[in-house]
Amino acid sequence: MEIILAEPRGFCAGVKRAVDILAITLEKYKNERQVYVLHEIVHNKYIVEGFKKQGVVFVSSIEDIKDNRGILIFSAHGVSKSIEDEAKRKGVQVIDATCPLVSKVHKEAKRYEDSGKELILIGHENHPEVKGIIGRVSNPISLVQTMQDVYNLQIKDPDNLSYVTQTTLSIDDTKEIIATLKLRFPSITGPDLKDICYATQNRQNAVKKLAKITDVVLIVGSKNSSNSNRLLDLCISTGKRAYLIDNYKCMNKNWLQGAEKIGITAGASAPDILVDELVNYLKINMNTKVSVMPDGFTENVQFKYTKW
């Protein structure tokens, strides 16, 4: 039995930046000021639980902050303008760990609105990133999740229309939705697939290749991770067996029955340690060898960190 690792996999630059910002803040202010994070810093159970053990308090609203002397960190997914304003009124120090690629979408949405465009957002309802984008503009945004949503759209002025997208969507699904939007509204403007995060695209392209050369694919990532779920969907769409797991403890050996080659990848919010533990578990229990997929590559993207 052989393990084949996808490349690239795991942490993207935006997730690494957010996790590092939280770790540095915690180290700088430990024993002095309480560190809060609005929602999960990234969608990964291992990361969140690790920070909880170090004293970080994760809150679901600004009202949950008990100590106004505390420090509040906005997660990688970004927040609405109203939440920013509420934090200012609360008087807490804010450190923004929003992924720069998400911030780019915020600016695009505002720019379209300022130019008088009616806006469509391609994204998943209730995802924190989507809530943040919607909350960056004053006028209502039409949310599109499926092709059927495109057909159901009620638009005031089809000739004055723009769209933006969530950064962690399926490239293939989004491409179809954009094509349908352009077919129905020929004058619509938008960024094509440029708003889909580079890491999301790279991991989806890699997992497609991985599915072709393996019998079963294991995706390391949390159930609430949008990009991890898209990797799962992609594998299943190819007809391959695929499973999304938080860590090696979630493994079921029956999943691997009849498999000679096991593909392993990880969502953009899953740390390397979880992949390493899974590989070690399989090496010990299944007598496997390990290789990296052909044509893989290492990402070299880095984002500037917030100054504080």
From Swiss-Prot:
Gene3D superfamilies in alphabetical order: 3.40.50.11270, 4-hydroxy-3-methylbut-2-enyl diphosphate reductase, catalytic domain
Pfam family, one: LYTB
Residues spanning the membrane: none
Residues that bind isopentenyl diphosphate: H43, H77, H127, S225, S226, N227, S269
Reactions catalysed, as given in the entry: isopentenyl diphosphate + 2 oxidized [2Fe-2S]-[ferredoxin] + H2O = (2E)-4-hydroxy-3-methylbut-2-enyl diphosphate + 2 reduced [2Fe-2S]-[ferredoxin] + 2 H(+); dimethylallyl diphosphate + 2 oxidized [2Fe-2S]-[ferredoxin] + H2O = (2E)-4-hydroxy-3-methylbut-2-enyl diphosphate + 2 reduced [2Fe-2S]-[ferredoxin] + 2 H(+)
Function field: Catalyzes the conversion of 1-hydroxy-2-methyl-2-(E)-butenyl 4-diphosphate (HMBPP) into a mixture of isopentenyl diphosphate (IPP) and dimethylallyl diphosphate (DMAPP). Acts in the terminal step of the DOXP/MEP pathway for isoprenoid precursor biosynthesis.
Name under which the protein is recorded: 4-hydroxy-3-methylbut-2-enyl diphosphate reductase
Native source organism of the sequence: Wolbachia pipientis subsp. Culex pipiens (strain wPip)
Gene transcribed to yield this protein: ispH
